[in-house]
Amino acid sequence: MRWTMLLSFPFQDHHRRHHLANLVRLRHLDHRCSWPRYCCCKLVWTLQSLCMR
């Protein structure tokens, strides 16, 4: 295991927890938000998480 991987591991874990929190928040907004808007938000968050990886 390279030292860069060791360094990035805690950050990945933090990001994963942050992403989970976003998913939970999306679930709460689900019944209030209209479906197209919900899908758009989900798409944006997915793209952001892919870019931040």
From Swiss-Prot:
More about this protein: Completely overlaps MCM3.
Protein name: Putative uncharacterized protein YEL032C-A
